[in-house]
């Protein structure tokens, strides 16, 4: 039965205590507004995975206020579709400032 109930959440900007939070230096994870998934995701129903193309974090062309590699920005992230747990990730650009958003996953 589909109820619309939220099953899980994956933070593309890792929160305190989450894997990758330390790549957002000087607590920039707290005030960086976005590292969204605005393009098409892909799914592998046989494996039960979903693939997220995560965009450049705000502000696209200036990264001085968000030091560090900024994981999971500008990455392909593979999640378990049932649990939302990260299976693997590949960060295409570390600390992106050129708006090289992945077009799809």
Segments predicted by a language model, with ranges:
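Short beta-strand segments at enzyme active-site cores
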Residues: 51-52, 88
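Short coil/turn segments that connect the beta-strands within blades of beta-propeller domains
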Residues: 46-48
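Short alpha-helical segments and helix-capping/turn motifs at coil-helix boundaries
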Residues: 34-39
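Extracytoplasmic/lumenal domain signature
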Residues: 1-31, 65-102
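Short, conserved, GDST-rich strand-edge loop motifs in beta-rich repeat architectures
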Residues: 52-70
């Amino acid at each position: 039965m589909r109820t619309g109930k939220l099953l899980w959440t994956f933070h593309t900007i890792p929160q305190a205590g989450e894997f990758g939070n330390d790549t957002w230096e000087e607590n920039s994870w707290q005030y960086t507004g976005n590292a969204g998934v605005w393009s098409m995701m892909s799914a592998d129903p046989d494996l039960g995975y979903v693939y997220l193309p995560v965009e450049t974090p705000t502000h696209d062309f200036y990264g001085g206020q968000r030091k560090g590699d900024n994981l999971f920005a500008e990455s392909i992230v593979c999640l378990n579709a049932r649990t939302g747990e990260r299976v693997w990730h590949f960060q295409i650009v570390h600390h992106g400032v050129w708006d090289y958003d992945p077009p799809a996953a």
